[in-house]
Amino acid sequence: MSTLAIEIRMSVAESVSVTNDTLSVNLNDGRTILVPTAWYPRLLHATPIERKKWRLIGRGHGIHWEDIDEDISIEGLLAGKQSGESQTSFKKWLEVRQTRITKRTTGHAKK
């Protein structure tokens, strides 16, 4: 019996853009992945400036947004996976975010 070894290379990201509606990722193999930002609630709630502040991680196997603490893998995008964050975790993040925004704009936390 003989076996055939096939090497599968995972595509990696080369560039990213995010609009109010769409996350777009250009891959090194020429494909572009387009998914709704609604799949990733933190991206959906991010400001345009925060959305632009991404960096590739793992040699292009993932994307990280420091300001909103979001990581998305290329493998997950290719598999059509949405955010796995629980509602509880997201609500907590949103509350902390709102507190920080309030502090920045008013100089103190909202009570």
Roles of regions detected by a PLM:
Residues 1-111:
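Motif-centric detector for short Cys/His coordination patterns
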